[in-house]
Amino acid sequence: MILVGADASVRPKITKKGIKMLIKTEQLEKELKQNNPETVFLLYGEETYLLENSLKKIKKNFGETINGINFVTLYENNVENLIQEIETPAFGYDKKLIVVRDSKIFQRGGKGKSKEKEQTIEKINNYIKENYNDVVNTCVLIFVEENAEKNKLYNTIEKLGTVCNFEALKINQLNAKLASISRAYKVEISSNDINYLIENSGTNMQDLINEIRKLIEYAGEGGTIKKEDIDALCTKQIQAVIFDLTDNLGKKEITKSLQILDNLLYSKEPMQKILITLYNHFKKLYITTIALEENKNIAVSLNLKPNQMFLTTKYKKQASYFKKEELRNT
């Protein structure tokens, strides 16, 4: 949604289907590259790497900032000062950039919210609705939240400003982004090897960026990243290690299993954490076995996220190594 001015003509972008509200991260990236004059944002979701990148671009588009003059950050403990900050002029500057972080004001009633917090939300919502043109004339206002529910304030910003939910990226999206980074440094890596990296290092974008940069530096310009490079250089998440351990246990490879366990202990993973992770893993294998018997959807039974769908094949394969009674009694 694009705001096209700061006077009475300010209005949301209209599409053939009506008012465009919640936008995708790709659309937000495109609009930020074009430096469109957005003024009120709600950015939230679990993909914090992309969220923080978008926040940096908004700040860059805004221009020079001086903390306390034309740049202010508010949090949950002082969000009630927001209206005052909006109305306080940015002396010597045309506009003020206000970032409100982790305010927890985008939650519906209940959930332990005090009456005072409810009143603050109502006050901010009414102020933005009634004074929107004044707000966009004087401020760029950005709300950054981990989670956001559709309360009154959410709906107001969705109608008048820009709301973007940074959902966890799917495997093909992660693959495309990592491939793009590699190409930018003139380093080759196959799609299969990128998927292998994701399986080993997890789906957190920041972690994957760190790992791919490490691999790019090792391969060098014109080089190629291979599976053995990933094994040698990248940090495996404990879940990936547990998959390796379970594979070897299922194949009765006791020596290899003990070696993996020794490596976990050598890396100073607490024994209690290892045992709990193993227990949860075998519990998932048992759930997989039951789901297969009852012809149920494995991903739904395991409550997998969209970027974890690749795990269904691995759980099915590993569940086949064990009898149902063995998994139930683990």
Which residues are covered by each model-predicted region?
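Intrinsic, low-complexity polybasic segments
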Residues: A6-D7
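Amphipathic alpha-helical segments within well-ordered protein domains
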Residues: A179, I198, L215-I216, T246, ...
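Hydrophobic/aromatic-lined pockets within catalytic cores
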Residues: G220, G250, L265
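Helix-rich C-terminal "collar"/helical-bundle subdomain used as an assembly and partner-interaction module
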Residues: M21-E26, K33-E46, N81, T88, ...
